[in-house]
Amino acid sequence: MPLRAPLERRWLHYAFLSRDSGQSVIANLSALGPDGDGHAPHRTTILLVHDREHGWHSSQFNADRPDHPWSSFRSPHAIGVAGDFDVAARTGVPAVKLRLRRTGRPCTSQSAAFGGGEHLRWQSEPGVLASGLVRLPGIERDVELLGYHERVRGRWSWPALGGWVFGFVNDPVGRSDEPPPTAVVFTLIQSRDPRAAASGSVMLWRRGRLVRHFPRRAFQVAVHDVLDRDQVVLVPPLARALGTAPAASVPRRLLITARSGSDRLLLDFRGSTAARIANPCETGLPAFSVHETLGACHVEGVVAGRRLDFQAPGIVEFAGGTGDADDH
Amino acid sequence: MTTDTAGYTGARLLADTIDALAERAPAVLAAAAEQMRGIRLGLRFNDGSAVSLTVRHSRLVIGPAAESDVEVAFDDRAMNLLFDLQRHPSDQVLPDSLDVRGESDRVLAVWRAFSLLSQRAAGLRFVQGLWRDYRHHRPQLWGHAIPAPAPEPDASEPGGWHALDYLERRRPEATRTDDETRVGGTVTTRPRLLWDGRDSTPWWDELPIADADLYDTMKACRARVAAEMTRLVPDREPRADLYSLVREYPARQGKGLRPTLTIAACAAFGGRPRDAVRAAAALELFHNGFLVHDDIADESTHRRGLPTLHARYGEGLAVNVGDALNLLAIDAVLSNLETLGLARTLALIRETLHMCRESVEGQAIELGWIHRNAVPGTDDDYFLMSTKKTGWYTCISPCRIGAVCAGVTDPRVLDRFDEAFRLIGIAFQIQDDLLNLVGDQAKYGKELLGDLLEGKRTVMLIHLLRTVADPAERKQLTAILGKRRPDKTRRDADTLLAAMRAAGSIDYAVDLADRLAARGIDHFERDLDIIPDNEGKAVLRQIAHYVTTRPL
């Protein structure tokens, strides 16, 4: 379906981590409805690569992208069949040339309605495998990555949406061509208008299959402390040159407890570094910020009578929090 | 901190806490002192130790037990709860745990002061560590009511699966061991819920922080800026006659006030501390360049406890080193282009030029007075000179430059620093001048009475010549002031100091500095209310109060 209205959006998001958390790749391919009849939709693509030794590298919002990006939501792929995913900054670095493979089944994380008729639908798929090349200035690395893919569609604007907290973690043990034994994805939409429209979910996959969905009444999210601002890097590079206004501090620790019947789950995330993506906002000049936070995650609990307990690198996204975006 | 177990008494703990707060969070002490003004407090602890607590200017002064207006005796339960990390400060009181005697209004004032001390200081990591240390070494002072750790939750239990419960009790964060160059993180905050299953609190709504640890922040800022300065000074020839000498003054580290103001102002506006480090290093290079030239102009013999550069290497080399420091500083400001971008770098150049212009104008005013053997008639003349000569580059410009590093370039916002830090800067300069007369040379670093030998026009000197009525004495004082520095003797300096003491000029200056600082603090709270209460602003607040609690 083509996008028609100015605030209609379709985002494809990709996030991968190496099993030793040495490399992380995040890409966002977004499409925004046209400004009016006869106009084309806006398309932006940004690629972020974090390397433990060399820190964050980012393209601008005009990264080269595939015409038909790999996505099980757009055109379903069979499990185990690889597809190309090549994204690169116009300057050539950073760049990724990856082959992506599904290992499990995607599922809807949530459908949220807020503001004046605004809404979004969030679909998630953990356990995506990626192998190929990552290119940074003067460096080229062969990588084997494990990660996550999502599609978010709907019609929303800021400040009505407010922000969100979302994250995922895959248990990295086991064979590299198999789905992770366990994966957790959570979403929390913190709509500003109306506040009561906040919604969220915590979902648990086991060997590629969704086994538990904790609805919004069944979990809590708490944060503690803030990430050292020196560990937060503003991207894309143009945002630094333009002197983008500061955003709120990113929480350093995030803890989720979920409980449903005799099932319980605890996710304890400690952030270590973040890239703050300053997104142009269609409804005003101030940027809207998304913080891609990398860190260590500990998951434990009992679900369907089976204990789980693992530690793994994870990514948590804190979106919103640009003070001046409140003034729209 | 006390090292022998016998020294771990209640009285010593209070004294150590007050000392730590004077150095680390003077705003907390100033607030408590404000409540206790005019009250003599006696404190006795259940280990038999006792002290008195009084207020002098804005300082809390600990002394031996003496006659008091209010007497407080703590038993072990009260000690257990006061500053207890496990409990909320408002839960401190137990029936019959505290014995407090005195007039009711004074008792209430003391209670307010201690509430302020406990509530505001309890979040500082250092104070928590201090009290933990005492509690570890002398547990009997507290009794034995340390709560047991919470049990692991049971899946079948209906409650006990709350996110906050984990962050606060079951899996609290271990004491942070971040490296010393980290800026921030000197206070602990409470965990908070973003989602409890029904209500949402935005993740970006940060908890306000009113106080921070100035000492640790200064240490971190000093270290980072010193490393940056080292990086900025070239390692090439001519080493012996230029670049080695260029490193001399920066290596004689000061308190780190300017680097801290610059970095804290950047953090206060939500910027990254890292983004302000190079600008702070540039300010330090300018400052050291000014000092080299200033020492030559003033014919000073010592700087930060060592001979001045010109005294050691001659005036020719020293002048050239001062020029080189200024050049390196300009280079450092310009090099922000690659990290901060064009807009912020242009604003930095503008701020730096303004700062330099103010400094040379202030220097000209003071040197002109000395050259003509004139002493200004009013304090306002001194305020103008002091603000221009040192106020801008010591206080006002570091704040403005830090804010620019965070991306603030609107003059209406930057100007909000001016009046607060103008007043605080003058108060700070008066205090510095007082320390030259009555301070401890080991702590002060400069030669004592050096200001009198070089004829510096201080508030004390202006007050003295305004006050002395006897024409003969005035003539004698003017004649001393008219001598060139090499011709002045220690006896001349002692004569001036004795006259100042007799005229009440020292006490006048102490009182004036206090009043100016209080006005500055008032402006700080009003003019800068646009900045939310965060750790960066909390550090600025501590610096604003630093003047009032600095020991004389």
Predicted ranges, named:
Chain A
Residues M1-H328:
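Structured soluble/peripheral alpha/beta segments that form catalytic or ligand/cofactor-binding pockets
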